[in-house]
Regions:
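Copper-binding active sites and cupredoxin-like electron-transfer domains
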Residues: 1-126
């Protein structure tokens, strides 16, 4: 196909954290990862994250860090999730070209509002 171009690129990483809770229900703190290894492993084995955030922290993509674009700009979004499947959705818009598996040599899907990103992979939408 024809080459594509874009005005800006945004990376969105979904991150899962597995933080154990103490008997009183508060999140436990450890001096280092080794000290909390067995407690953290027990939470990870449950496969239910205690926190899911974007780009490593709560609020990373809001306020002054919001992903903005001017009307008419072409934006490439690269979206990844290390552990679980996810479905990015553009409210009020669509991905003209979507590579769910992130392989730009493959033909893209066209005109999707929601697409599927497999856990452990990244996809892209333009």
């Amino acid at each position: 196909g024809a080459p594509v171009s874009y005005d800006r690129i945004y990376y969105i990483g979904e991150n899962d954290f597995y933080i154990p809770r103490g008997e009183d229900g508060t999140y436990m703190r450890f001096e280092d990862a080794g000290e909390g290894y067995s407690d953290m492993l027990a939470v990870m084995n449950g496969l239910i994250p205690s926190h899911v955030v974007f780009n490593g922290k709560v609020g990373a993509l809001t306020g002054p860090d919001a992903l903005t674009a001017e009307q008419g700009e072409t934006v490439l979004f690269v979206h990844s999730q290390a552990n679980r499947d996810t479905r990015p959705h553009l409210i009020g818009g669509h991905g003209d070209l979507v590579w769910e598996t992130g392989k730009f040599n493959n033909p893209p899907e066209r005109d999707l509002e929601t697409w599927f990103i497999r856990g452990g992979s990244a996809g892209a939408a333009l």
